[in-house]
């Protein structure tokens, strides 16, 4: 289905997965006896074990059969990688950005002021990522912050390990 993999990350030696097989037998019937889906109700698919599952789980199972490993995280992995890569920029001591040491993010994040106040630091960090690929930055920040499980937006320390994050970042390029 269109958009089924929009938030799913797949990786296998930098290769692109083959399209999913279009077999009608893989779809679970909707709960409705008419065969129609109810408005607002998610479609259900038949998973590898025969039980109903979400379209995301179905896709991950199909790609796993091709040797790929994947994650469905609704953008959580990308957000986590962004925060690790831009940590030093996000947490610069900009006046007014932090009122308490318990904030998950600077108060000006998502505003024009955020970029204006950090323009040089942002450009420098992006150039560093272009030059090195950023894996070293992810490693450094993760190794420093993970032991304390620093409370920061997008950081899901218990959900994604450093090796997993590095592998995904490398696959994304």
What are these regions (language model features)?
Residues 5-173:
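Nuclease catalytic cores
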């Amino acid at each position: 289905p269109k958009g089924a993999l929009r938030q799913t990350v797949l990786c296998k030696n930098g290769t692109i997965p083959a399209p999913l097989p279009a077999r009608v037998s893989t779809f679970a019937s909707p709960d409705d006896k008419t065969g129609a889906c109810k408005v607002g109700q998610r479609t259900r698919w038949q998973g590898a074990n025969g039980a109903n599952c979400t379209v995301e789980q179905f896709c991950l199972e199909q790609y796993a059969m091709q040797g790929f490993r994947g994650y469905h995280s609704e953008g959580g992995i990308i957000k986590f990688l962004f925060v690790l890569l831009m940590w030093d920029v996000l947490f610069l001591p900009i006046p007014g950005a932090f009122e308490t040491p318990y904030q998950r993010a600077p108060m000006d994040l998502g505003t024009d002021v955020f970029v204006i106040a950090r323009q040089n630091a942002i450009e420098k960090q992006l150039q560093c990522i272009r030059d090195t690929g950023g894996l070293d930055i992810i490693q450094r920040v993760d190794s420093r912050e993970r032991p304390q499980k620093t409370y920061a937006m997008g950081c899901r320390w218990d959900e994604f390990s450093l090796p997993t994050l590095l592998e995904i970042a490398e696959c994304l390029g």
